[in-house]
Structures are given as structure tokens and as C-alpha cells.
Regions:
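Cysteine-centered catalytic environments shared across enzyme families
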Residues: 1-321, 675-678
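Adenosyl-5′-phosphate
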Residues: 13, 19-20, 68, 92, ...
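Hydrophobic (often cysteine-bearing) scaffold residues that line and stabilize catalytic clefts
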Residues: 74-78, 97, 155-156, 216-224, ...
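Phosphate/ATP-binding catalytic cores across multiple sugar-kinase/actin-like superfamilies
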Residues: 221-243, 337-342, 513-518, 654-659
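ATP-dependent adenylate-handling ligase core
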Residues: 277-339, 357-373, 548-555
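Short acidic/histidine-rich active-site segments
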Residues: 344-360
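Conserved phosphoryl-transfer catalytic core
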Residues: 368-414, 418, 425
């Protein structure tokens, strides 16, 4: 039954509504002070019934606009507030909400359903629709798979995109790994009846409200205020709060601001740091610099305490999808279980902070496009002062700073290449680099390969994606960039918001497959451990402001991400605030390949014997060849790094498929009973 498959969501109970053609189930997890008054599904006097999973951040504003009596304001849960907003403003209510939410409202008089998902997709919502017959929705796919009228056929295009590592910056589509099950897209609402199905993008960014910001200092102060408010909204709970503290700029910013907010309330912030027990990937000194300032209850999680295959399989079951974590699932499993053990009901992250507050690389890209080579050289010189600290390949790391600068300038300032870049002839760019032998060097040399081209991600999609189709088995070979649907996705998100053209590349990075996919993963894994995962950088107010941050401010004379660095002055330790390097986790990935028991070869062969379709999806010869190369000392590290990710994607797929086949989902109602659901 659906309610059984989703029972992990009902930490504080559940309730049902069943009347006429409609049925709803609500699972309770108390977070905010007023959530203890939730009684869902909730029916209004006007015959509208709501179920919601929501944290509404602009409650004070809505309570005033809806003229809620003063004596009842403290007792109105978010679901009741959303229902009142819908009855007041109709479908426009979704864009009046700030926060993380999904909700569905059934109109008993018109036999019509209205569903909406928050602006960035922090909370997931899935549905199955058989027009004129049935519309079913759930917070997790497994809830829909528990219904026997929902087909369970897998989507091979989705599998091919996963295996080939198609760019996460492609446009987000509503398809899941199951052909018949769709996801409500972020910033969209659905209207459904027996005769109608429609979906609409609703986000009005209203960027003109920032027109009063003129100077860098104006933007820094506005960013600081908005960021602190974003964190504060996510700490509104009577339960313990946790934060992921890697020691990076983003997680440290969130942790330090949350610490200050909670200290003022006499509370401590639980922090969790993933100790990968590998010197090359050690961020502990940065985390310890934050912890030294006090106000934290810290927990170290050791990655080696968790089995690789077991945790990968657990993540597949929780998410109804192959894992997509960049760092291996044991690293994530550790702090998820730790948060659960401490009784925390909110986990704060710095997720995608470097996408929302970007690197300001337009400062390099614009003069490249315009052929302003003197300006480019000047700005590149600033960039290179810090680029020498990046985690490049071992070969390039051994070079002197001057040689690194000369190397990049030599490539980018070559006349033929300059003309091709200026004219956006990307195929020619690749050809030039290939002929000169610099293609691998440039695009394998750590951060730089992406960041110079970052603002042109749509045009450079084929280069940035770096998909590799040789890993695809015979049944998936058709799903390359020449496939119409793959090609469509690679164009990036449509400009539904109507924003100016020069802001579109940044908008497309935010409104992308990767952004929403990882929100889904965090939400599901958190739900299975009894807490909500909250991402302050994904607050709609912060995103709207960040689209307008001056490029020169973010570039910050080559230090990059200047807005967040300047806004965090006096809030976090200087050693972390000015940190120029992100850790490279590829040594951890290599170690996992070398030490996994059983070996990747044995694991694959055993799974393929049990599930022959894996040989149709995965090119076995290529898979085994890549393992041999990655374990060998005869190949350069940068070459092996290009291959190893597809091996992990293959293992993730194996565990997803095995979970799907070996854990049949419970069925709830017979097919014949649902044929006249409307």
C-alpha cells in the first residue's frame, strides 16, 4: 500500500481523506513551532482540501495580507496559510510564497486538483497521469510504484544520460527513471481534472526591485542581510539543528551564520565533518579553524566505517534512482546517520553555493568574445595569481606559476583560436586544441577547463558535458547528442522568466538538471533519516539578488566569489574566508576503486549474471578495460580521471536496478478499481 511504502515519512503520525473520486494521505514530521498544530488533510469551509510539505518563510507578510486575526497567528500551520492564500489569490498564490514547499489542493465543488512545487525544487513531488482515468501523486516515487495500476518500465534515455555522464547543466526535464512517472518541475504548478491537464511556470523574478543598489558595497550589504535571513528562516524549529561543515567557503558561511543565530537563542549548532582519512583530500584544518571560534557541538564521521556497496544500495532505495553523489555514498551515509542519531530535524548545507554566487568569470569571457586582448591579458594575469593554487593534474602542479600562466596564454591568445572563440565556432575551437595537442591539457587541467567558458555553458554544452558514449551497451547506443531529446535538453533551460539575455547563462546554471537532481537526493535521504535538508543558498530571494551581482565584484581581482567573501568579513575565520582552493576528491574515488570488496569486476559480473539486461545497458568490454586502466600505473592520472567516473556511474546503476528488481513495491489497489477514478 502507498501509506506503507511511505511510512518513514510519518515520524509524528499520519491521516487520510477519502471521499468521492479523491483520496489523500498526509505524513507528519514536526519541524516549525506551529507544525504541531497540523491536521492534514485539511478541509476549508469552501470545500477545498490541502495536503502540503512546506516551510513558509514569509509567514508574517502573508498573515498580514490575509488578515488573519492576531490571536490565532501563532497557531496557524503552514498548510492552513497556503490554503488561505489559494482561496484568496488562486493559482497566483504559488509565486507569493517564499520557502520550500510542495502542496496539492482538491476542489470538491469543481473536481479539480491544483499542485505546486517551490521555486528551486527543494521539496520533490511526483505523479502518474492516465488522462480521464486517474491522477496519482506522492512525495516519493516508491509511493506511486506501490499502486498496481502504475507501470514500472524503466526509462532507457535517462539511464543512458546517467551512464554517459551527460552534463548536469542541461535543462531539467520532468522525466524520472520510470517512464510513466513524472516530476513536477520547480517553479511550476499543475491543474488537473478529468478533462484537463496543464502545467505552467510561475516565477516572476521582479529584478527591478534591486535597482537602488548602485555600488559594490550596496550589493555586499544587501547580500549579507539576505543571506543571514535565509539561514535564520531555516533554523526556525524547536528541535536540534545540524549543519554539514566541510571547511569550504559555502558550508562554513552557513555554519558560522547559523551558529551566531542559535547562540543568541542559547542553543548550539551540531556540525558534521566527513573525515575521508586520506591526506590528499583532507579539509579538516579548515573545519577546525571554524570550530575554534566556539558555539558548535561537533561530530567527525569516518568514511571507512561504512561499506561502499551497502550504502550505495541504500541510497538507490531511498531515492528510487542511481546515486549521483560526486563523493562516494559512504561519505554521505555517515553524516546522515549521525544527524539522525542526534535527533536533529533540520540539516543545513552549503549546497550549490558556488553556482548561485558564481566566480565572476565573465570578466575573462567578455573580452575574449569581443577580441579585447589587452583587457583579457590584464584580467587573466589577476586570475593566474590564484589559479596557480588550483588542484590541477600532477603534471601541471609541478610547473612553476610563470609556466602555468604562459601555458594558458599561449593557448588562448593564439590568433586562429582567438577568432574562433570570438565567432563562437566551438567545433573549430576543439579542432585547434586537438591539433595542437592541448585539448586534453586544457580541458583536463582542473578548474580552468570549465571556468573560462562557464558563462557560455549553453554554447559550450557539448564541450563542458564531456560525455563518453563508449560505456553504453548495445541497447543504449542511440542515446547520443544526435538524439533529438538529448539535443533538446543540452540547449539549457528555457527563458520562461523573461530575464535579460546577459543573465541567461547564470540562470540556466541554477535552473538545471544537476541543481534539482541533488535537491531531490538530499530530500529523500534526509526523509529516510527523519529530518529535512535545507539549503540557504537556494533561497529564492538570494538567487534573485545573485543574478544581478556585479561580475567584477564576484571576480574580485582574480580571487573570485568576491561577494560571499566580502559579506562574511567578521563572521568566519580569515583562513577560511580567503581560502582559494577547493579540495579534489579524485584520490578518494581512486582509492575506493582499488579497495572495494568484492572488486568492481567481480561485482559487475555477478550482477550481470543475475540481471542480463545490464549487459545490454553497459558495454562490458569497455567497463572491464577501464577498470584495468584505472588500476594500472602505466597511465597518467588525468587520463584515468576521465574514465573512472563512468565506472562509478555503472556501479550506481547496478545497485539501483538490483534494488528495483529484488524489492518489489507493495501494491495498493487493483487496476479495475481505478479505471473510473474521476
Amino acid at each position: 500500500m502507498m501509506k506503507h511504502s511511505l511510512r518513514h515519512l510519518a515520524l509524528d503520525g499520519m491521516n487520510m481523506y477519502l471521499k468521492g473520486p479523491a483520496g489523500m494521505i498526509s505524513m507528519y514530521l514536526h519541524i516549525s513551532p506551529e507544525s504541531v498544530y497540523e491536521r492534514q488533510p485539511l478541509e476549508s469551509a469552501k470545500g477545498k482540501i490541502i495536503v502540503a510539505d512546506a516551510r513558509i518563510d514569509n509567514r508574517v507578510q502573508l498573515l498580514e495580507e490575509l488578515q488573519i486575526p492576531e490571536e490565532t497567528k501563532a497557531f496557524i500551520p503552514d498548510s492552513e496559510l497556503i490554503l488561505a492564500a489559494y482561496e484568496q489569490w488562486g493559482e497566483e498564490c504559488a509565486d507569493r510564497l517564499i520557502g520550500d514547499f510542495v502542496f496539492a489542493i482538491w476542489d470538491t465543488h469543481q473536481n479539480r486538483l491544483f499542485c505546486a512545487r517551490d521555486h528551486i525544487g527543494a521539496r520533490p513531488l511526483y505523479y502518474y497521469h492516465l488522462p480521464g482515468k486517474v491522477f496519482a501523486f506522492a512525495s516519493e516515487i516508491k509511493g506511486l510504484l506501490a499502486l498496481d495500476f502504475v507501470p514500472q518500465d524503466l526509462d532507457e534515455l535517462k539511464i543512458a544520460a546517467h551512464l554517459s555522464r551527460l552534463s548536469d547543466f542541461r535543462s531539467y526535464v520532468d522525466g524520472t527513471y520510470f517512464q510513466s512517472i513524472k516530476s513536477v518541475k520547480p517553479a511550476h504548478f499543475l491543474t488537473v481534472s478529468a478533462e484537463q491537464f496543464s502545467q505552467k511556470f510561475y516565477w516572476d523574478l521582479r529584478l527591478e526591485r534591486f535597482s537602488h543598489l548602485k555600488t559594490d558595497e550596496d550589493f555586499i550589504q544587501e547580500f549579507r542581510k539576505t543571506f543571514i535571513e535565509s539561514v535564520r528562516c531555516r533554523t526556525r524549529t524547536a528541535f536540534p539543528i545540524a549543519a554539514h561543515l566541510s571547511g569550504g567557503l559555502d558550508s562554513s558561511s552557513v555554519s558560522c551564520v547559523a551558529r551566531d543565530i542559535l547562540q543568541a537563542e542559547g542553543k548550539e549548532l551540531h556540525t558534521f565533518h566527513m573525515d575521508v582519512e586520506l591526506p590528499e583530500c583532507d579539509e579538516k584544518p579548515y573545519a577546525e579553524a571554524v570550530l575554534a571560534e566556539g558555539g558548535f557541538r561537533h561530530h567527525y564521521v569516518k568514511i571507512n566505517d561504512y561499506d561502499y556497496y551497502k550504502t550505495t544500495t541504500e541510497v538507490a532505495y531511498m531515492t528510487d534512482a542511481p546515486s549521483a553523489f560526486v563523493v562516494t555514498p559512504p561519505a554521505q551515509a555517515g553524516w546522515m546517520k549521525g544527524v539522525q542519531k542526534e535527533g536533529c530535524r533540520v540539516l543545513l548545507t552549503g549546497h550549490e553555493g558556488d553556482i548561485v554566487v558564481d566566480y565572476g568569470m565573465d570578466v575573462l569571457w567578455e573580452p575574449l568574445k569581443k577580441g579585447q586582448w589587452e583587457v583579457f591579458e590584464e584580467k587573466f594575469e589577476e586570475f593566474a595569481q590564484y589559479a596557480v593554487n588550483f588542484n590541477f593534474s600532477k603534471r601541471i602542479n609541478a610547473w612553476s606559476p610563470q609556466k602555468i600562466k604562459t601555458f594558458y596564454k599561449g593557448i588562448l591568445l593564439e590568433s586562429e583560436l582567438r577568432d574562433s572563440i570570438a565567432e563562437r565556432r566551438w567545433g573549430n575551437v576543439k579542432g585547434i586544441l586537438t591539433r595542437r595537442g592541448n585539448w586534453k591539457s586544457l580541458f583536463e587541467a582542473g578548474k580552468f577547463r570549465v571556468e573560462v567558458a562557464w558563462p557560455a555553458i549553453t554554447a559550450l554544452g557539448r564541450l563542458k558535458a564531456n560525455p563518453n558514449y563508449t560505456i553504453l551497451g548495445p541497447g543504449l547506443q542511440k542515446y547520443t547528442l544526435d538524439h533529438p531529446e538529448v539535443s533538446r535538453q543540452m540547449k539549457g533551460a528555457e527563458n520562461n522568466a523573461g530575464i535579460p539575455e546577459h543573465l541567461l547563462p547564470h540562470y540556466q546554471q541554477i535552473f538545471s538538471e544537476g541543481m534539482t537532481k541533488f535537491c531531490d537526493i538530499f530530500a529523500h535521504v534526509g526523509a529516510h533519516h527523519g529530518f529535512k535538508v535545507a539549503h540557504p543558498f537556494l533561497d529564492r530571494r538570494l538567487i534573485e539578488l545573485s543574478l544581478l551581482l556585479p561580475t567584477t565584484l564576484n571576480f574580485n581581482e582574480g580571487k573570485r566569489r568576491g561577494t560571499i567573501r566580502e559579506a562574511m568579513k567578521g563572521i568566519m575565520p580569515e583562513s577560511v574566508r580567503l581560502r582559494a582552493v577547493k579540495v579534489n576528491f579524485e584520490p578518494l574515488i581512486h582509492q575506493t576503486l582499488l579497495t572495494a570488496t568484492p572488486s568492481f569486476e567481480e561485482y559487475y559480473k555477478s550482477a550481470a549474471e543475475q540481471h542480463p539486461i545490464l549487459r545490454i545497458w553497459i558495454n562490458e568490454k569497455e567497463f572491464l578495460k577501464r577498470i584495468e586502466i584505472c588500476k594500472s600505473n602505466d597511465y597518467p592520472e588525468e587520463f584515468k580521471s576521465k574514465l573512472i567516473w563512468h565506472l562509478f556511474r555503472s556501479i550506481y546503476l547496478i545497485n539501483f536496478y538490483s534494488t528495483y528488481k529484488e524489492n518489489p513495491y507493495e501494491k495498493e489497489v487493483s487496476r479495475t478499481e481505478t479505471e473510473s477514478s474521476w
